[in-house]
Amino acid sequence: AFGGQAAPQAYGRAIADGSVLALVAALGMAPSSHESDVAAVQLAAVALAMAGALGLLLPRAAPQQARGHLVLWLVGLLALTLSGAAWVAVGLPLILGATQRGGHPEWLGEHAKPNPKPAKRAVWLGLLVTLVPALALGIWHGPVLSATPVWATPVAWLQWLGWFLWPTWPLLLWTLWVWRRQWRTRPLLLAGLWLLWTLLPSLVAQGPRLLALTLPAAAMLAALALPTLRRGLSALIDWFAVAFFSGSAFVLWLYWAGMTFAYPQAAAKTVSRLVPGFNAELDWTLLLPAVAVTFAWLGAIVWRVRHYSMALWRGLALSAAGAVTSWVLLMTLWLPLLNHGLSYQQAAQRVASQWSEDRGCIDATDLEPSALAALRHDAGLQVRVGRDALACPAQLIAQSASNPEPAQTEGWRVLDRFAPINPRVMQWTLWQRSAR
């Protein structure tokens, strides 16, 4: 009415910038950064598919743009299917179809009419891309699903979910409240259904990694809250990010000094107790990037204090920068410790000492993806899971450390039993099929 308002494209790009920052800031991005895990591929695939789906709902997009969105959509679905999450991928075309038919197009403008043809075509092609490979290869159930979920209680699941989605979930809830009367507009409907669908597999997963599939939809919903935040609330988010990530960086540096120089002694004793046998050495190739990113973090704080930005994404800038800072410090200062305490390399080599590749394959259906990668890459073993592993002459089973003795099974004998990482958490038992 008064002029000076942002153009729709500029406004949309600012929201998109905020969603990227919300995704980067999410703590759930960190777990897959150190391990050889398929979760990173699945996260990228979900993000690609979502970007394509949103583009396909645009009104009267140019043919070249529509083809580009369709390619993103199909590549994302195919990658998600082949990475072992076909049960997730097959539902996404149905969500796109439901959004196209049931969503209101008010967000497109008064006189804009959606073009249903690209979205309808994408639904059928998406079902084809997901169903054909899944049925042909028999990959409906990936190795991350379990008949007995890892969550002891619903509260434990909610705690992991809150940790994975921090700091996006408070903004997500605010979006759902502020825009509750517009929930049938297509961006909100698509992101909401997408979030609910990607949440379901985590309820029956072997671990929390499948929660990462929720991050793209959660980041988009969180970004839609940014235009409604008051200046005081945005500043509160900033200062919380400064306090939280500065404290995190201080703790990381403190324990690095303890494990490297044995000072402070309390930190050194804690590391020795939690990771026995670890001896840290000063590595300049890891230290210099850590110093650089720490100064960059301090510079980001100074920039935010001295300059007031009118950009919509300002409330998430420090959260994203702090998350990147903590991740870089973990991957530099703490990398030797993580390799020693969390890597399956030594465990894989121990299995290889008991079972050589020429003796046949090993059934490792019970193991998580990072352990499978270590057995294949570090030990060079033939590892199989699921139905392909039924005929293997050896079996590697993961059991709780509270069960000290493996149950005897007719036709099998124990070759070795040891703790792959932490003896208080898990034990591996290597079984060999007895000769008949």
Show the residue positions of the predicted features.
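Membrane-embedded architecture of ER/inner-membrane glycosylation machinery
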Residues: 39, 56-436
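Transmembrane-helix signature of polytopic, membrane-embedded enzymes
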Residues: 1-25, 43
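Short acidic/glycine- and proline-prone juxtamembrane loop motifs at membrane-interface regions
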Residues: 28-42, 85-88
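Transmembrane alpha-helix boundary signature
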Residues: 2-4, 32, 59
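Structured catalytic core of nucleotide-sugar glycosyltransferases
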Residues: 30, 42-55, 60, 174
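Membrane-water interface regions at transmembrane-helix termini and the short interhelical loops
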Residues: 26-32, 304-308
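Alpha-helical transmembrane segments of multi-pass membrane proteins, especially transporters
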Residues: 19, 23, 43, 47, ...
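Juxtamembrane loop-helix boundary motifs flanking transmembrane segments in multi-pass membrane proteins
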Residues: 17, 21-29, 146-153
